[in-house]
Amino acid sequence: MAWVPIKARLVSLAGDLVSLSITDVKRLLDKAGIAPKKSLGQNFVVDPNTVKKIVRLAQIKSNSRVVEIGPGLGSLTLALIDTGAEVSVVETDGALIPLLTEVLNGGARIVHADARTVDWQDLAPGKGWDLVANLPYNIATSLVIELLDEVPSVDRMLVMVQREAGERIAAKVGDSAYGAVSVRVALRAKATVVGSVPPSVFYPKPRVTSVLVAVERHKQMESSNEVTEEMIRLLRQSFGQRRKMLRKSLTGVTTPESFTLSGVKPSQRPEELDVKTWLRFAEANLKVRKS
């Protein structure tokens, strides 16, 4: 069968969002003589209903400015472009750039870079950016935290991640997945698991179930940089020994006065404290250390 350019076959009809089918993906990969890289977590979305769901949950509109991390071959990107939004994509795999360029046909800015090292001030200047990403398990939580800490221009995110990672990002006090990651995310944003994505919508099919996590940045920070850094220090030490009571896990870095001043009980364990309590504890510990 003769190759028909992707751009000649992808149109938006009756409100249906454009996307790449599994046939499109296989043909593009075969044409380039490449295969999905497991090391990069390359599982391409090939289900139009999933693409539509992601765009809807991300609340992308015609006046949105969107960064997509890990566009792959551009299936979701096409749907983002179709909304009329301004779209930039960051792809780390150089082998996909020519294919992505063909598929998108000038509809989005393509940046060949690693999202962990890209110049975000150039990529997403100012305020009010949305971010959509399909993140590999090994970088998902660290990248979400890095974006919240260091890229204030991104107001909202919708990330597709392995279920276990998504549960950690969005966990609240009392949830089994609640940990240091949950606290650090809650410091700067509200995170909610808003959907599940089965393996069947990807090519190739992963062995895990993914979830969609919506992350909306708080309008104001609740602490100074100094208190935040102290909280992170306490989180790392306490959650590294999460089954121990705080008076044991934080021996040498806190004092009885820190507990008294903050109202935190020495017998509590780290997963019992929400982000506001952690901030109060960190602030008290700093005050005692300086006195």
Give the ranges of each region predicted by the language model.
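Catalytic cores of RNA-modifying enzymes
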Residues: 2-237, 280-286, 290-291
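An accessory alpha-helical subdomain
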Residues: 208-217, 223-257, 265, 270-276
